[in-house]
Amino acid sequence: MLTPIITNQNLFGKMIVYRNLNIKKKHKGSVIAIGNFDGIHTGHQKVLKEAKQKAKSKKLKFGLVTFEPVPTMFFNKNVKNHRVNSLNQKISFLQKIKLDFLVIINFNKAFSNMSAENFIKKVLYKELKSEYVFISQNFKFGKKRLGNIKILKNFEKKYLYKSIVTIPQKNKNQIVSSSLIRKIIYKGRVQEVKKLLGRPWCVEGEVIRGDQRGRKIGFPTCNIKLNSYTLPKLGVYLVQVKIDNLKKRGIANIGYRPTFNGKSLLLEVNIFGIK
């Protein structure tokens, strides 16, 4: 499955996706959650649930402000395998929880140099006219990540919003975070990742044509480019594959193309029952 082309404004079900801050009037004065939300793990889900409940109680619209690319990948050009999920997966998950709208801010050089107060003033106040702003406890924003909970609280009266901090979600006395999940993925502990995400971890990618050698030895595989995903420990995994509406089990190898004797890192999947 490929990431959809998202223009200035797209409709995904009943959820509108904005790629700039030209926000419709009906979405101004809403309840807003802010963050990278990479993986949309159980901690993120807690933030979204509380924000959604507030929106319902106040009869307001509910939206999320997030960033693309993930800031870590913007600041570290050499970091290629960092994401827990793709933008397409993020959009799909948010659509399922019935978000009213999603704002994807282009994280570029100009935006990275915006001060914390300017972010509050220009994005939360002028463009969104936010009524309530929900964040996780460790969220940082603005130039050099100087914006934090204290800064957000300090500007509440000036910019006419109320900020609400969600208590962190914990698992075995550890705060659930995207960075923790990446570390666990690196170690290949995918069942543990499932608990932190609240669902199985999955990847999507373009199937590329190989040399057909696996087919010749009776072990045909789909070769999938993983792009910017966090890569698990090299090895063999039992997987479930979804192709359109068809679900199949299979076995996958993440490594250096064992059936091809090559050196490039690849995900190869043998899907049971498909020749």
Predicted regions and their residues:
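N-terminal catalytic cores of NTP/NDP-binding nucleotidyl/phosphoryl-transfer enzymes
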Residues: N22-H82, S86
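Positively charged, low-complexity intrinsically disordered leader regions
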Residues: L2, N8-S30
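Phosphate/ribose-recognition catalytic cores of enzymes acting on nucleotide-derived substrates
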Residues: I208-K275
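Active-site-proximal cofactor/substrate-binding loop regions of enzyme domains
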Residues: L64-N76, N81-E127
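Residue-level signal for inorganic ion chemistry
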Residues: H41, L94, V133, V193, ...
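Classical nucleotidyltransferase
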Residues: N113-P220
